[in-house]
């Protein structure tokens, strides 16, 4: 068992070895205003937010915007979700990532393909240009983990 002093020294050394946090300047970033309409808790609670792992991702033929994701949602059955984010991401850079999806939306056909859910992203404007970032979480979170 380590002495309390030795444990403190190790903690201090580990803290000194970590890289300083890079500060990001958000002063030129514009975000959409918050919704004024309230959603009751029961309605919100019906949405099933899950961690999903990207098994495959490809551009949808004849579409400039759509990417087709093949996802592991923890059920053992692949889930397909389409997302109009090709302007922001190349398909190959998303394979292996852990994303957040709403999994209990009814299927919606796009370009003849059923999309079974929605991937969550954040959108803002920076220097007059729209930016989009998929919500990605730590890869240690297993596919199918429920978010509360």
Regions found by a protein language model. Give the residues of each.
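Phosphate-backbone binding interfaces of nucleic-acid-interacting proteins
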Residues: 1-148
């Amino acid at each position: 068992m380590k002495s309390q002093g030795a444990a403190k020294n190790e903690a201090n050394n580990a803290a000194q070895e970590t890289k300083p946090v890079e500060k990001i300047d958000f002063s030129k970033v514009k975000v959409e205003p918050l919704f004024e309409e309230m959603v009751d808790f029961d309605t919100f609670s019906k949405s099933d937010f899950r961690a999903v792992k990207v098994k495959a991702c490809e551009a949808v033929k004849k579409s400039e915007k759509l990417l087709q994701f093949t996802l592991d949602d923890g059920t053992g059955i692949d889930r397909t979700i389409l997302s109009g984010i090709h302007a922001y991401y190349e398909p190959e850079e998303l394979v292996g990532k852990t994303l957040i999806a709403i999994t209990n939306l009814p299927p919606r056909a796009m370009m003849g393909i059923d999309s079974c859910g929605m991937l969550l992203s954040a959108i803002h404007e920076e220097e007059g240009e729209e930016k989009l970032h998929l919500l990605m979480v730590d890869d240690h979170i297993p596919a199918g983990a429920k978010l509360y």
